[in-house]
Amino acid sequence: MNRKYIPFGLALLFCLTPFVSSPIALVIGFLLASFGLVPTELPIASFTKKLLSYSIIGLGFGINFEQALSVTSDGIGLIIATIVGTLVIGSLIAKVIKLETTTAYLISSGTAICGGSAIAAVAPAIRAKDEQIGLALATVFVLNSLALFIFPVIGHALNLDQHTFGTWAAIAIHDTSSVVGAASAYGEEALTTATTLKLARALWIIPVALISAVIFSRGNKENGSKKLVIPYFIFWYCAAIAFSDFFPQLEVVYHGIFTIAKQALVVCLFLIGCSISISKLKSSGPKPLLFGVTLWVLISTTSLSWLVLR
């Protein structure tokens, strides 16, 4: 038996436990790949693609549709503006710094909607490679970690009220977990506002993934490929949201499915990390992180300015 199976198998089992978060799983996979401990004969790429789709569908059971639609009109308007603005500005910045299109689009999608979940949903629609997904996720996770500590400090320094901070956190912080962490540190009202707006923001995974499939299929046609990749799992994601909304009495079951889906996503990130190595990171250079930071700072400062000066 290939000796690589032992450390790989142990790491995989460890990622199945609740003690491992998504960023840690990505790092574990990255370390295994960097030390040459990933069995090359395993169909990791194809398995990861399928598991990602199932994970996203499962996450749909954790979306409260009515609560997501109960946000204020001002919040919805700002969310729409920042999502569209982020994708457009991201495209322009990518051209300026000459960053590879797919990686840039994944980072933009994660920044625009809800971090890692958005990247995982959009990736199959645009035929992103594991290496590109990994770079985008790593960039988003780094910025998430910074936001968790920086945002409350900025909020107190500017004396932001609870509602304003909650709205800002929901718009400018990528992942829901970091939004909840930063908002809860600021106050209960901020937490309620941030959570509700973030749920509404998460619903945009659906149209963005579908539109992305069309946009990138046109680009593929120019390169000789005529196939449109339709992310069918998005329709099942919608079905999961609708089903849980129509039958709320099964909330315990939905919570269980959502928990399993989140853990499956952790495993996905471990497998994606297995496709990244130090040599691949060196070849990509600092551009992905530079792109992510620039886009994040622009969206954060613009949305904060609008909230404070309106």
Curated annotation (Swiss-Prot):
Transmembrane segment boundaries: 7-29, 44-63, 75-94, 104-126, 133-155, 165-187, 199-218, 228-250, 257-279, 289-308
InterPro entries (alphabetical): UPF0324_pro
GO cellular component: plasma membrane
Keywords: Cell membrane, Membrane, Transmembrane, Transmembrane helix
Name of one Pfam family that matches: Cons_hypoth698
Membrane topology according to the record: Multi-pass membrane protein
Annotated localization: Cell membrane
Top-level lineage group: Bacteria
PANTHER family listed in its UniProt record: INNER MEMBRANE PROTEIN YEIH-RELATED, UPF0324 MEMBRANE PROTEIN FN0533
Family indicated by similarity: Belongs to the UPF0324 family.
Name of this protein: UPF0324 membrane protein VP0936
Species per Swiss-Prot/TrEMBL record: Vibrio parahaemolyticus serotype O3:K6 (strain RIMD 2210633)
